[in-house]
């Protein structure tokens, strides 16, 4: 079994700053680095470092030759990559002192993929092979359809979310891997649990993985649901967290490992990646992950905790304007003190911080899915003024 990754290859220009720049602001960077990147390249590096046989297909520009060398040096087959006489795709990445990031992407050569090239690449693969995809290249819909027709298992990470995903035939996708915000945009739910319920109704044959940051990840396939706690890590750069998880997840599928093992290894690899700077350079090898795992600590979490977290999320989402810790303690039938400790244990935040994050998530959902003016959105989520800014959204929604 082989993995084909039809994915982006970018040049990442990474700027280290005290805080992420907002509208009208000029901030001096304390450090600037150039890294190989692109979600496609990162995920190929992750899958290859996880020991899987990976073939990367992409179009790179005149300034992107080193990207193919990076892939090759990490064990990926690059014989299917094309070169075009134009500038390569690139990303400008701001990373603040807490390791959080904001990213601007220029697609460049990533949008030069056409149907003829797709057909030529897919001719090298057969039924049962895996194909990994992200939303940074052209012809996504065509690639999914043709790969599905060949009997390949399609693994889609629908990131970054954009309008071109709205008409995808999700039933042709074998595995969807996305974060909570992406799940809400793609499936329409207001929480991870609600998104999973909607997925079961809309795409019952598709396995869904939702990554939840510090809360871990959840996998659903039919009636089977598996929760994986996050591993504790000192985050310095979260850029490659999702890509590391996706690449390791695909590698585990390629080896037909149990889903519980796949989730645990992918989560550990992701935790190691966020403790390092850069995108592709931060991704650990399988040997590193296996050696580190015995010493790594999982954040507390299980099915019961997932249900408790759902109750907390449902309470806050249903009471955005009036949610209080006292109200939550009454809802859970916990003491005020116990409710506060539970929120902190499950989310890594105080109740006030968690409620603010849920309000910001709700605000962003309204901004992206409606034409409501900001003043109305602000009032709807519980702010007396238009207090949520672009900086707050980027800082709090990961």
Regions flagged by a language model, labelled:
Residues 339, 343, 388-389, 393:
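Short hydrophobic/aromatic patch on the recognition helix
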Residues 291-314, 318, 326-332, 345-353, ...:
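Short, Lys/Arg-enriched, Trp-marked, Pro/Gly-tolerant hinge/linker segments that flank
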């Amino acid at each position: 079994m082989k993995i084909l990754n039809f994915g982006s290859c970018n040049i990442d220009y990474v700027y280290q700053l005290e805080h992420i720049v907002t509208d009208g602001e000029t901030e001096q960077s304390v450090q600037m680095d150039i890294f190989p990147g692109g979600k496609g390249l990162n995920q190929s590096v992750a899958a290859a470092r996880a020991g899987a046989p990976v073939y990367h297909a992409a179009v790179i520009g005149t300034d992107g030759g080193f990207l193919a060398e990076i892939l090759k040096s990490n064990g990926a087959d690059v014989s299917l990559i094309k070169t075009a006489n134009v500038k390569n795709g690139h990303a400008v990445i701001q990373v603040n002192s807490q390791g959080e990031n904001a990213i601007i992407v220029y697609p460049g050569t990533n949008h030069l993929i056409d149907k003829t090239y797709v057909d030529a690449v897919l001719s090298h693969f057969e039924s049962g092979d895996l194909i990994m995809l992200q939303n940074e290249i052209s012809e996504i819909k065509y690639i999914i359809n043709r790969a599905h027709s060949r009997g390949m298992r399609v693994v889609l990470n629908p990131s970054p979310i954009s309008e071109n995903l709205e008409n995808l035939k999700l039933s042709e996708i074998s595995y969807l891997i996305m974060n909570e915000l992406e799940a809400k945009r793609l499936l329409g739910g207001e929480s991870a649990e609600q998104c999973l319920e909607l997925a079961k109704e809309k795409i019952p044959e598709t396995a869904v993985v939702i990554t939840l940051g510090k809360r871990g990840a959840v996998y659903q396939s039919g009636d089977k649901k598996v929760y994986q706690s996050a591993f504790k890590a000192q985050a310095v750069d979260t850029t490659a967290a999702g890509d590391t998880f996706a690449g390791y997840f695909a590698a585990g599928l390629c080896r037909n490992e149990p889903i519980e093992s796949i989730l645990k290894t992918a989560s550990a690899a992701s935790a190691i990646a966020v403790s390092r700077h850069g995108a592709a350079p931060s991704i650990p090898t399988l040997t590193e992950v296996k050696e580190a795992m015995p010493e790594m600590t999982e954040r507390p979490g299980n099915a019961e905790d997932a249900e408790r977290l759902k109750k907390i999320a449902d309470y806050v989402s249903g009471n955005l304007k009036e949610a209080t810790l006292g109200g939550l303690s009454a809802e859970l039938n916990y003491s005020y003190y116990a409710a506060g400790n539970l929120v902190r244990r499950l989310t890594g935040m105080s109740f006030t911080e968690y409620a603010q994050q849920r309000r910001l998530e709700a605000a962003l959902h309204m901004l992206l899915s409606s034409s409501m003016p900001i003043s109305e959105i602000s009032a709807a989520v519980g702010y007396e003024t238009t207090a949520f800014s672009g900086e707050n959204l980027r800082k709090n929604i990961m």
